[in-house]
């Protein structure tokens, strides 16, 4: 055996799962669920009683947290569903580039330059107007299943 046999390529992903299992019957409204491989927020849950052949079923109506599309799924209540790990992180806005990207300041003092402006026109307008007025803006970034998107803007200027 040579040393090459024990060599592996490291990647940025540490191999942590992007989802965790949860029994369908325990997922509630305003929780999260993966439907059609998309992270969603549950807006409605209804349960049907056990029928002649089998399990009680949970009917989930959910909204994709990144694109706002409505998705539905029906799962036996005793089965496990994938639930995404959803995180929200706040960053300070440093710059908005011409090509539609933002430059953000992380807690550790580094810059994060790989995030595009969101599709929400009102949010983009709020960001651009605040930035041009010289306000200190904090952007909330939602992260789930390897995707990131700006979801909120806060002005922390303090009466400038």
Swiss-Prot record:
Pfam families: eIF-5a, IF5A-like_N. PROSITE patterns: IF5A_HYPUSINE. GO terms for biological process: positive regulation of translational elongation; positive regulation of translational termination. Residues 1-10 have a biased composition (Basic and acidic residues). It comes from the Eukaryota. InterPro entries: IF5A-like, IF5A-like_N, NA-bd_OB-fold, Rib_uL2_dom2, Trans_elong_IF5A_hypusine_site, Transl_elong_IF5A_C, Translation_prot_SH3-like_sf. This is Eukaryotic translation initiation factor 5A.
């Amino acid at each position: 055996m040579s040393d090459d046999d024990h060599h592996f390529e490291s990647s940025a992903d540490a191999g942590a799962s992007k989802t965790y299992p949860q029994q369908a019957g325990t997922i509630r409204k305003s929780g999260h669920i993966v439907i059609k491989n998309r992270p969603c927020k549950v807006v409605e849950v209804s349960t049907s009683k056990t029928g002649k052949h089998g399990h009680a079923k949970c009917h989930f109506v959910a909204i994709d947290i990144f694109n706002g599309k409505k998705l539905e799924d029906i799962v036996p209540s005793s089965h496990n569903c994938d639930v995404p790990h959803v995180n929200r992180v706040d960053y300070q806005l440093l710059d908005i580039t011409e090509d539609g990207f933002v430059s953000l300041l992380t807690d550790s003092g580094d810059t994060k330059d790989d995030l595009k402006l969101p599709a929400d026109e009102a949010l983009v307008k709020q960001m651009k107007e605040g930035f041009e007025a010289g306000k200190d803006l904090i952007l909330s970034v939602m992260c789930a299943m390897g995707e990131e998107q700006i979801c909120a803007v806060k002005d922390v200027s303090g009466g400038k």
